[in-house]
Curated annotation (Swiss-Prot):
Chain ranges passing through the membrane: 8-28, 56-76, 86-106, 129-149, 185-205, 233-253, 262-282
Cross-referenced PANTHER family: TASTE RECEPTOR TYPE 2, TASTE RECEPTOR TYPE 2 MEMBER 13
Keyword terms: G-protein coupled receptor, Glycoprotein, Membrane, Receptor, Sensory transduction, Taste, Transducer, Transmembrane, Transmembrane helix
Name recorded for this polypeptide: Taste receptor type 2 member 13
Cell compartment(s), UniProt: Membrane
Membrane topology field: Multi-pass membrane protein
Further comment found in the protein's record: Most taste cells may be activated by a limited number of bitter compounds; individual taste cells can discriminate among bitter stimuli.
Amino acid sequence: MESALPSIFTLVIIAEFIIGNLSNGFIVLINCIDWVSKRELSSVDKLLIILAISRIGLIWEILVSWFLALHSLAIFVSGTGLRIMIFSWIVSNHFNLWLATILSIFYLLKIASFSSPAFLYLKRRVNKVILMILLGTLVFLFLNLIQINMLIKDWLDRYERNTTWNFSMSDFETFSVSVRFTMTMFSLTPFTVAFISFLLLVFSLQKHLQKMQLNYKGHRDPRTKVHTNALKIVISFLLLYASFFLSILISWISELYQNTVIYMLCETIGAFYPSSHSFLLILGNAKLRQAFLLVAAKVWAKR
């Protein structure tokens, strides 16, 4: 049974790869068609396009890394190839996490209602705020790349001094663990920011519901519905990102103790996040949902 597990996990990874490419490609295609036809695009749609493109890159990185790890081919990659592979993973993962976090901030500033002068100032300049945050995240990306480059340089120096097979395998596993740990630490910041946005949205919704009760109005007013929809999107991101984060953390520990089965399971769970969250974004967006249902109806009619 255990010998069949790599094949089973590989099939799941391939399925996630296909779903992820289809869902993210759909987001890019529909928004680009809308952009061309209307000659303009909202800020949230632009965010969705960039997020979807970054996730397509991440999904491809996951697939390539999976097969390299499965056949222990990573240690045969040259220094330049190793840098390209790891750096492209870091860049795609960085924008994948931060753009989803920025989307949460966008919903917070657009939907939430607070009397704080600072919040109102940010709310009036939401597009500039989003742009500044996006540019600010490049600092984290730059620091992450510097740290990883130091780890790569250190490993390559040791590899050139001792090229025996046993040393290469064990030292590469140590190097891989260090890279994963560094990436995990840099992933904590966007998760924390998204979680704070979620708490503020919940607090804003609670205040709004209390106000509705005082005014003897029902909870089905448009503002409540907008709050609820935004919360669903942010909650789905947080839950899936938490599973992604935990899978990276556990795979890091399992790789440290050389538990291959747990490592493969965590990698499979981690790949579920960039594939499934984009599908949930389609269902949570009125334009994308309508286009998806239209395409699904046409496909079903041809059967």
